[in-house]
Amino acid sequence: VGVGQPLEITDAEVLLANKISGAPVVDAAGKVVGTITQSDIFRVLIALTGIGDRGIQIAFMTQDRPGSIKDLADIIRNHGGRMVSILTSYDNVPEGFRKVYIRMYGLDRAKLPALKEELAKAAKLLYLVDHRENRREIY
């Protein structure tokens, strides 16, 4: 089993579905030009989510409508937070909703209660993880 260049997310999906932990990467001529492993995919995931920057991650369930993520982002910015990453998912949510995961930093922890209160008016809070303080809250 090999994967082509450029590597696509569907390639990672095939590797996962078949429980393959690594595979050669081949060019258009079929020549092996490298390898891809689960560790490589984990590194990409870590880079995309911004977890290396620590900070705070909040998960929401919000209406799937234009502007719903912007509303959350505006609230965070208004409280002095800066966003590292925003991820969304439609897995395990009712029709018309989506999950939104926002990782942020630069927020004064003393302002966190007011931020959570305002965010809760805009979307359903699912959980909060403060990686610096090693604290988790599930709602």
State the predicted function of each range.
Residues 1-14, 25-27, 32-33, 52-53, ...:
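Bateman/CBS regulatory modules and CBS-like beta-alpha motifs in cytosolic regions of diverse proteins
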Residues 6-8, 37, 108:
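Helix N-cap and loop-to-helix transition residues
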Residues 16, 20, 26, 42:
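Conserved glycine-bearing catalytic or ligand-binding loops at nucleotide- and phosphate-handling centers
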Residues 21, 33-41:
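Short hydrophobic beta-strand motif reused across regulatory alpha/beta modules
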Residues 25, 37, 70:
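Short, flexible micro-motifs
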Residues 42-43, 84:
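Conserved mixed alpha/beta catalytic, RNA-binding, or beta-rich assembly cores of soluble enzyme
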Residues 48-139:
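A conserved regulatory-domain signal marking ACT and ACT-like small-molecule sensing domains
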